[in-house]
Curated annotation (Swiss-Prot):
Phosphoserine: modified positions: S21, S40
Transmembrane helix found in the keyword field: yes
Extracellular side: 89-100, 149, 209-216, 322-333, 435-437, 494-503
Name this protein carries in UniProt: Quinidine resistance protein 2
């Protein structure tokens, strides 16, 4: 049973670093073991394993651009709508609470759709689900541009969110397919950073379009843009799911999973399509619509999703409140309201990109420390067990205290960033309440946003690390928490502002988020043991 346990656990992506370090044995120990041998063993020829991914650095750059372009239309659909909330309110003769419902339903379906569509992406492949998602979104945008009643707006906003929202989770899956853990933080950060351009500049774009051509122009813009995005995805987005295309060198059997770009000779040569690495194909993932609920059973995952979800909810609530406050308290035009979203947007973009680069640096630093520590522990165990290499290897592989702490590598700075963003949002709320100069409101909005979305990169990268074969499903669960909590707070925003004013609302949200961040200490101390135990239970290993 011990041997079987070792072979199974070794296959877990969570143990990648352990496998790496086991390959580089201490030179002194190797010399000692060599002295005990009495027979000369002829060395076997070295077999070079195929690379984790055949996608070149330049091709990965293309993937980043395409994923970000697709994800852009998911993030912008929410932000581009904020400047016209007051316009929609007047157009359909509804109150502030009802116009906020159009934002709430968008977040609800933005959370629900990826939770289930992620399973299709993990089993049927990334490419088909992305193409279907864009088509649904394209149709919904045309419908919204032609909508004549409030009810039509509500229904089509639901369809719009359900259509495009899965691509955010699928993009994380694509990055997980083509990257190693050492480089993943940077790539996830870049994709998330460019995706968030929609949130960063969506309000500005929406304000410009609506002030010039009316509120319907924003949906025509989204329809035209998503149509172009569909053509680009259809032509160049390859299938990356490893049970379908391996490391990228295996041509998918289904034509739905084949990108036309693969017929180009340079691409075929680069990906080794004529000499595929079949050994990199993973076992097929069965479609299981209940898989998200199994992921949510994990204690450590629920903690991570709660903390990240509350932070994201506070960020989106601040964006919604900003539109209302600027138009009603500062009496700004739609175009000026859009400009006021720039500080938040630019700081959000900077924070996500910098957070991704930090993750790569911190991962390398902690991995180097871990390998040195493990080398010393291995040498000590060899002395205690008469240089029995196999026994020592089994001990290390089956004791969680010897595993690399991926939670520390990904979440170490999160507590500080959460406290800073919560403080910034609290100050932002009180600036609006006391009608401070507009510059003060925008400075606090930018400061809070600079630290707010770091947790997005930290949590997404960690989720991809923990669920390498179910990345879209797992990221969809994270998205569910974020969007449902956002919907709850935005739905209650107008009532809360009536009772507590903006200052009280954001003080409450800041206190809630800061308090929840304390739970991260559980993950830093016990996360790797919880994940190790969960993985063994999933594999049926005692």
């Amino acid at each position: 049973m011990a041997g079987a346990t070792s072979s199974i656990i070794r296959e877990n992506d969570f143990e990648d670093e352990l496998a790496e370090s086991m390959q580089s044995y201490n030179r002194e120990t190797a010399d000692k073991l060599a002295l005990t041998r009495t027979e000369s063993v002829k060395p076997e020829p070295e077999i070079t394993a195929p690379p984790h991914s055949r996608f070149s650095r330049s091709f990965k750059t293309v993937l980043i651009a395409q994923c970000a372009f697709t994800g852009f239309f998911s993030t912008i659909a929410g932000a581009i709508y904020y400047p016209v909330l007051s316009v929609i309110e007047r157009k359909f003769d509804i109150d502030e609470e009802l116009v906020n419902v159009t934002v709430v339903v968008y977040f609800v379906f933005q959370g629900l759709a990826p939770t289930f569509m992620g399973g299709f992406a993990d089993s049927l492949g990334r490419r088909p689900v992305v193409l279907v998602a864009i088509v649904i979104y394209f149709g919904a945008c045309i419908g919204l541009a032609c909508a004549q009643t409030y009810a039509q707006i509500i229904v089509l906003r639901c369809l719009q969110a359900a259509g495009i929202s899965p691509v955010i989770a699928i993009n994380s899956g694509i990055m997980g397919d083509v990257t190693t853990r050492a480089e993943r933080g940077g790539y996830v950060g870049y994709v998330a950073g460019f995706q968030v351009l929609g949130s960063a500049f969506g309000a500005l774009i929406g304000a410009g379009l609506s002030s010039r051509w009316g509120w319907r122009a924003i949906f025509w813009f989204l329809a035209i843009g998503s149509g172009i995005c569909f053509l680009a995805s259809f032509l160049i987005l390859p299938e990356t799911k490893r049970n379908i295309s391996g490391n990228g060198s295996v041509t998918p059997k289904s034509y739905l999973n084949r990108a036309p770009i693969l017929v180009l000779p340079t691409v075929r040569k680069s990906l080794h399509l004529d000499n595929p690495d079949y050994e990199t194909l993973e076992l097929p993932t069965q479609l299981n619509l209940l898989a998200p609920f199994k992921i949510l059973k994990a204690y450590e995952i629920c903690i991570l999703m709660l903390v990240a979800g509350l932070q994201f909810a506070m960020y989106t609530t601040h964006l919604t409140a900003l539109s209302t406050a600027l138009s009603k308290q500062y009496h700004l035009t739609v175009a000026k309201v859009g400009l006021c979203y720039l500080p938040s947007g630019i700081c959000t973009l900077c924070s996500i990109v910098i957070a991704g680069r930090y993750l790569n640096w911190n991962y390398r630093r902690r991995l180097k420390y871990y390998q040195n520590w493990l080398g010393k522990k291995r040498s000590k165990l060899l002395e205690e067990h008469d240089n029995d290499l196999n026994l020592v290897q089994r001990i290390i592989e089956n004791d969680p205290k010897y595993t690399f702490n991926i939670f520390k590598a990904r979440l170490q700075p999160a507590f500080v960033t959460l406290l800073l963003s919560s403080s910034g949002f609290c100050a932002y709320g009180w600036c609006i309440t006391v009608k401070a100069p507009l510059a003060a409101v925008l400075c606090m909005s930018g400061f809070a946003s600079l630290f707010s979305n770091c947790i997005l990169t930290f949590s997404t990268t960690l989720i991809v690390d923990l669920f390498p074969t179910k990345t879209s499903t797992a990221t969809g669960c994270l998205n569910l928490f974020r969007c449902i909590l956002s919907a709850v707070f935005i739905a209650a925003l107008s009532k809360m502002v009536e009772k507590m004013k903006f200052g009280g609302v954001f003080t409450f949200l800041g206190a809630l988020t800061s308090s929840s961040s304390i739970l991260l200490f559980i993950l830093l101390r016990k996360g790797k043991e919880l994940a190790f135990k969960r993985k063994k239970q999933e594999l049926g290993v005692n």
